[in-house]
Amino acid sequence: MAAKEVKFQADARERMLRGVDVLANAVKVTLGPKGRNVVIDKSFGAPRITKDGVSVAKEIELEDKFENMGAQMLREVASKTNDLAGDGTTTATVLAQAIVREGAKAIASGMNPMDLKRGIDLAVDAVVKELKSNARKISQNSEIAQVGTISANGDTEIGRYLAEAMEKVGNEGVITVEEAKTSDTELEVVEGMQFDRGYLSPYFVTNQDKMRVELEDPYILIHEKKLSNLQSILPVLEAVVQSGKPLLIIAEDVEGEALATLVVNKLRGGLKVAAVKAPGFGDRRKAMLEDIAILTGGTVVSEDLGIMLENVTLEMLGRAKKVSIEKENTTIIDGAGSKTEIEGRTAQIRAQIEETTSDYDREKLQERLAKLAGGVAVIRVGGSTEVEVKEKKDRVDDALHATRAAVEEGILPGGGIALLRAVNALDGLKTANDDQRVGIEIVRRAIEAPVRQIAENAGAEGSIIVGKLREKVEFSYGWNAQTNEYGDLYTMGVIDPVKVVRTALQDAASVAGLLVTTEAMIAEKPKKESTPALPAGGGMDF
């Protein structure tokens, strides 16, 4: 085992704080409508230009192991916020840096780290409660467009496309973002269904870059039991090979010899095939397979219906224009099922929703209805260069997550104002001791950080902006960094989803609390490279 280096207390915190600062300083310049760009060098191709906080955070790796630990823990804040809310990563990073900095100062002056953390947690809970109580439900399409625009760094075109996509497929529909082949950004809405099962073997992948299986105009075999060998479906497999079309197999499971044979056939190029597990469990699985059959115009191969695998013909297989399978989900686009049958099925599901008394069953039925009736919207992002397209696609992804979050939990005034106003919730908090009170004050100062940073990125003085905002008490009164105007942010369209603001604060406080209470750090000692001995004669030629 290699020798380890151990750092304690102030020394450990100082090194960690240096790492936190490096990562946070690189990420926070992207915050707000006037956020700056960060250029990331790539080992191949052109450098990447981005304003996406989590993309910047993922690129940072420091040489000093102790500093790197601090940076990586802060990176975790950005990643976690991105996973939960899909946006707000830069805000979370700015908040975490502010809490860690203030916390380190308090500990250096002799405060108890555990009490500080308790105070921080108390304050965060109070602020989150205040944010939720001031949330405004989203009702109009224009508000969805505003959320999308803000999250896409002020790009109104992206906001408009997202609002249009959500209007067409509903809040439950599936929206995907792709790179366009032209310089124009466009929206395409396709009838389709997505379920949370991915390919059974990575050998089925056809698009190696995106690790995705793409089948054009495939046949779809829908089977409710396991497939262990292919003997029983050889006749239908041969018929599919003759037709020259790809085949998707949806079954309870495809295992052993059956899976191995399919993989070998795919690799040899004999049959373009992919297999996925059927979605759901028990009776719900049967219902979902029936949904897929109706959508694709196929038949579920089920012993309950008296259909044996040996008797399956091409006519019993479903058809679709395209099937896209990723590691964890499958999308069937433009199924060949008849419109009247699909409408009949959706009416049947709606009736079941009306009748059911179980919240869980209702939720699952609504999911099925959305998959049958919702469809898939594809936003194709265009640009003049590959670099521009990638940067824009990052912003569209952020904006998509933000709009979903806004519909889910409602909206708040944007520009960091909601956090600044929520500071009132900290006034009446009772604490067990003075150290916990300091923890609350740390959060009070930290939640000003996003407004200050947005102002600095826009070329304004943060403390002047904060001072002016404090003069007014209206919750939605704030400063619009894009236009440099003060007023009601709802009216100006500067809004943030509650989920994004809440998640950013909670994740920042969670990781900052861990950093503040760290007393020791252990890392492997760097190996000293020994200089090779010079050859006799010092390399000179006599």
UniProtKB/Swiss-Prot annotation:
GO aspect biological process, one term: protein refolding
One of the entry's Gene Ontology molecular-function terms is: isomerase activity
InterPro entries attached to this UniProt entry:
Chaperonin_Cpn60_CS, Cpn60/GroEL, Cpn60/GroEL/TCP-1, GroEL-like_apical_dom_sf, GROEL-like_equatorial_sf, TCP-1-like_intermed_sf
As recorded in UniProt, its EC number(s) are: 5.6.1.7
Q: Which family does it belong to?
A: Belongs to the chaperonin (HSP60) family.
Q: SUPFAM superfamilies given for it?
A: GroEL apical domain-like (SSF52029), GroEL equatorial domain-like (SSF48592), GroEL-intermediate domain like (SSF54849)
- Statement: the UniProt record of this protein carries the keyword Transport: no
What protein name is recorded for this chain? Answer: Chaperonin GroEL 3
Pfam families per the record?
Cpn60_TCP1 (PF00118)
Q: What is its main location?
A: cytoplasm
